[in-house]
Amino acid sequence: MKKLFAALLLALTFNSQAMAQPRTVKLRVIQTSDVHGSFFPYDFINRKPKAGTLARVSSYVNDLRKTYKDNVILLENGDILQGQPTCYFYNYINTQARNVAADVVNYMKYDAQVFGNHDVETGHAVYDKWIKELDCPVLGANIIDTKTGEPYVKPYIILNREGVKIAVLGMLTPAIPNWLTENLWSGMKFENMVTCARKWMKIIQEKEKPDVVIGVFHSGKDGGIVTPEYEEDASLRVAKEVPGFDMVLFGHDH
């Protein structure tokens, strides 16, 4: 886990319908990605203290919220359910309790969670339960339910901050079949990210008319595995080829 979080400042100047003069709204956007169960400042595998965990990020975010209040947007970009013994315990042993990954995401008050390939790796019983336990929506516009033809989880969310309407679109690398057996993702298929982004950008712009569109993709910048069926790391392609994004955040490749 080389890259746990990124913080960006988005300053917007726009004309409010209720005001004659334009005004500037500053939003602090925080992304965490590829946490791999590093919730606490201790490595339970190697049995030693651990830096760069969500415990530290939580302190940082709490400090930001003192200044920016509700203008802090906190986004989790996948691969959170797997990686430490604490995850294994709640995924497969103490399955009656709420998953620790849900407790942490809820405690930190994330605005949205994106699916990662290692989240899919845990299997339906684990991630379907986890989705229900979260206070925020899980996003994955290109994760398609094969029975309905619709996204398996929410494709996007709308956030409102000081009159600014923000759309957040989430996607997952479609290379899942390269790594995981079908029993782990039965009833699902994974669409090409560029095609999916074009489709949902049109829907979002026509239906929601947002001031800002943020893409949050559990897919690397570029490269990775490329086959006739899928492209593993397509975040840069989406940013270049799909007009409308004000910010694109990516993960997966650490």
Where are these regions (language model features)?
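Acidic, metal/ion-coordinating pockets
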Residues: 20-254
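Bacterial N-terminal signal peptides
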Residues: 6-15
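Positively charged n-region of N-terminal signal peptides that target proteins for export
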Residues: 1-4
